[in-house]
Amino acid sequence: MGKRIVIALGGNALGKNLPEQMLAVKETSKAIADLVEAGHTVVVAHGNGPQVGMIQNAFAAYRKQEPSADVIPLSMCVAMSQGYIGYDLQNALKEELLNRGLQQGVATVLTQVVVDGKDPAFQHPTKPIGAFMSKEEAEKMAREKGWHIAEDAGRGWRQVVASPKPLAVVELTTIRALAEADNVVIACGGGGIPVIATDHHHLKGAAAVIDKDLASELLAEHLDADMLIILTAVEKVAVNFNKPNQKWLDTLTPEEARTYIGEGQFAPGSMLPKVEAAVKFAESKPGRTALITLLEKARDGIDGKTGTRVTC
């Protein structure tokens, strides 16, 4: 019997520019179609770290030429990234399904996610976005543009922005209805458009980028998914990563995860939120499983052949 699965796809897996994205979504679609073909109901969430930074930089460059142009809020940049990533991914996935003789629909839902305007994350930016830079380039941007910057898991330096905790998925009912009607749904792009609920049902955009793994966990929990698959750049979670005593983990319990987190084993903004999201989902209801693995290993991971499985 097929499972209801939420996939959290990393923004870096979608390429650094539009041509790369066009190629990346084709490979991504093959892996997603494998799961659909196996009889699973699939909802796809994705990151947007590189993409939202590119959009923000493009508008900043335009304002240099047109100083009177409006400043585009970060929440609107997230919305734009949902649109253009969803467009490419939706078309590539539909094409792949049709090539396999599968008739499921594919729908992208512009998704808002509620955050707390008083979340301390707004005072302590941690979420990397945009292009990787050298330390010198990053320090220059910090001086000239007032950016908050940080090293990103040894891969270079990036701008960091606020990443508040996701509280509710506004379009949850729509996403559920589409999934139950045998559609592959693309939702919570970039962690969702961050909004703050004000009086009289008004939603106000927030200057933030929500972590897509935590947003995907929230979505999976409230869709009553059987499995959350968090895709990353490695086949399994490791402790002592990139050290001589590195150890790959086939399984991980919440208790073990908390011990490793306390030891600082997982990089903030990289593997840490993935493990935290996996633990939260596994603990949310008996029988739920989270899987952390490579995109191309997702189907094998479901079958228990690879990846790191997080269960209670």
Model-derived regions: residue spans:
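C-terminal catalytic "cap/lid" subdomain
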Residues: 2-312
